[in-house]
Amino acid sequence: MKKGLRRFLLALAVLIIASSTTRIVNAAEEEKPLGPGWLSLDCCIGPLDNAIANGKDSLQKASGLNFGGYLDTSYTWSSNHPRSPSDISLRYFDKDYNKIVFNNFHLFVEKPEKDWGVGFRVSGDFGRSGELLREATLWGKALHKEPSAELREAYLTTTIPFGEGIGVKGGLFVTTLGTEILPNPGAYNDNISRSFLFNFGVPLRHLGVLANYQVHKMVNVNFGVVTGWDDPHDNNHQPSFMGGVTLTPSDMVTFASNLIYGAEQRNGAPKRFTISNVLTVKPIDPLALYLEYTYGQEDDASLGGTRDGKWQGLSGIASYNWTDRFNTALRAEVFNDRDGARLLGEPFGNHANATVAEVTLTGSYKFTKMLLGRTEVRQDWSDRNMFKRGASTADSNQTTLAMQLIYTF
């Protein structure tokens, strides 16, 4: 993580130096400034924001590349005080209890297709999130002592001149399933913590090829072939197939349904199927509503392997921008793992037919255009004792509090 921090400081210095040679941007081209705020830090951090933005702009123009990133640090507390190890149960990217964690120094570089007919995107994570992403997506050899650097995405893009154009990307890319995402600069999840659906219901990344086609101005379809769920290695010489459709009947409503099907185990016999349906509604400008239903099943994946494993979950998120600085997001969900196939990592073994639920409230405030602060309270429940308490007991609920700072450039 120290190497990642050094890289961040070096990149920051380059951007500031480059900004000294940047001409003043015309007022018409400048972004609209944030409104006044009691907690605004525009007076002291705003000049740094402007220097970095100007330096980035000049470097992008000189190189013909788009690039950026963010720095993310957070702290999470749990009412269960887990010990030995001090991991918060059924969490992943926010599982470290009572620690100030340098989560991420994220960088991306991309090239549009317009110059060469072929574009690319490469992005990487440096820090704790890099370690956890590597563990979660089976790139590492073991689930511990992973390096604090991980290649998140690396793919080429092109467009086949057929009809409206078939967009194709090949390489390592983030999944199309689910509401929540692996965050990108300026595109974060509405909450600090991730949902159970994100952690256990859907994959995170794929290695393969994915195409998309605009059938109609309201209809987009995608289809592709990948090595499987979160596994860059072809562990069974059988590809998995992805497909989906996105419907946009109006500017206010979007519905996306995506699925993946294929063999995920080493012997290649059991097949896994998952479909994720996400409805997005934006009835008024400050308000966004998200509703997700995800269903999955896998052959012979129950505890003991005596029957198929099935899981499903329902979640809803309401996000409201009270001002251009202040946002609140409320998330609620329920997730059922009927056969103990998905809720892995429980403190005292997996449970069949376990149901977990949570309600999360997150407040976000933009101290400047680039500096975002967030606080969160979350309550988890289960019909089983699945949440570790102390060193040797488990409980049916837990409460967590979290704080986060994100600096985007």
Locations of regions flagged by a protein language model:
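N-terminal periplasmic/intermembrane-space "pro-region" immediately following the signal or transit peptide
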Residues: 2-85
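Outer-membrane beta-barrel pore domains
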Residues: 30, 41, 91-94, 130-133, ...
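Outer-membrane beta-barrel channels and translocator barrels
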Residues: 62, 112-116, 161-164, 175, ...
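Transmembrane beta-strands of outer-membrane beta-barrel proteins
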Residues: 67-73, 118-122, 166-170, 221-223, ...
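Residues on the lipid-exposed face of transmembrane beta-strands in outer-membrane beta-barrel proteins
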Residues: 69, 73, 102-111, 153-158, ...
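Outer-membrane beta-barrel pore domains and translocons
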Residues: 72-76, 123-127, 173-175, 224-229, ...
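Surface-exposed coil loops of outer-membrane beta-barrel proteins
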Residues: 80-99, 129-155, 159-250, 256-263, ...
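Glycine- and aromatic-enriched membrane insertion/assembly motifs of diderm outer-membrane
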Residues: 92-129
